[in-house]
Amino acid sequence: MTLNLCVLTPNRIIWDSEVKEIILPTNSGQIGVLPNHAPIATAVDIGILRIRLDDQWVTMALMGGFARIGNNEITILVNDAERGSDIDLQEAQGTLEIAEANLNKAEGKRQVIEANLALRRARTRVEAVNTIS
C-alpha cells in the first residue's frame, strides 16, 4: 500500500507521486506517516522532509507551511522547498556562513529574529544535502 504525496509551493509543484512513508517536520516535532494514517492537519516547521520510496530515502528542505493527511493522501503546502539532490552544497554552506555572520552582528530584536530564521533555513538546506542516502 502507498501514499500519494503532493508538495506544493505558491509557484510550483515540487513533488507529486506515490511514496511508501514520510517523516515530516512539524511545529511539535517530527511525525512519521504510513498508509492508513489517521487524518490530521498540522503546521509544518522549517526542516527536512524524508520520503521513502521502495528501498531509497529522498530528502527535501521545507521552509514552513501546512500539511493535510487523510485517505492515504498527503498534501504539503510550504513557503518554499528544495529537493536535497538539487541543492549545491558549496552554495548552501556559503549561505550558512553568511547567516551565522549576520546573526553575530544583528542588533535589535527584529534583526536577531530575522537572522535566526535565515540561519535555520540555511542549516536545513545543508542538512538536506548531507542526509541524502
Swiss-Prot record:
Subcellular location: Plastid, Chloroplast thylakoid membrane
Highest taxon above the source species: Eukaryota
Transmembrane segments: none
GO CC entries: chloroplast thylakoid membrane; proton-transporting ATP synthase complex
GO molecular function: ATP binding; proton-transporting ATP synthase activity, rotational mechanism
One Pfam assignment: ATP-synt_DE_N
Topology relative to the membrane: Peripheral membrane protein
InterPro entries noted in UniProt: ATP_synth_F1_dsu/esu, ATP_synth_F1_dsu/esu_N, ATP_synth_F1_esu_C, ATPsynth_dsu/esu_N
Protein keywords: ATP synthesis, CF(1), Chloroplast, Hydrogen ion transport, Ion transport, Membrane, Plastid, Thylakoid, Transport
Primary site of residence: plastid
Protein's job: Produces ATP from ADP in the presence of a proton gradient across the membrane.
Family from the record: Belongs to the ATPase epsilon chain family.
Quaternary structure note: F-type ATPases have 2 components, CF(1) - the catalytic core - and CF(0) - the membrane proton channel. CF(1) has five subunits: alpha(3), beta(3), gamma(1), delta(1), epsilon(1). CF(0) has three main subunits: a, b and c.
Protein name (database record): ATP synthase epsilon chain, chloroplastic
Species for this entry: Piper cenocladum
Source species taxonomy: Eukaryota, Viridiplantae, Streptophyta, Embryophyta, Tracheophyta
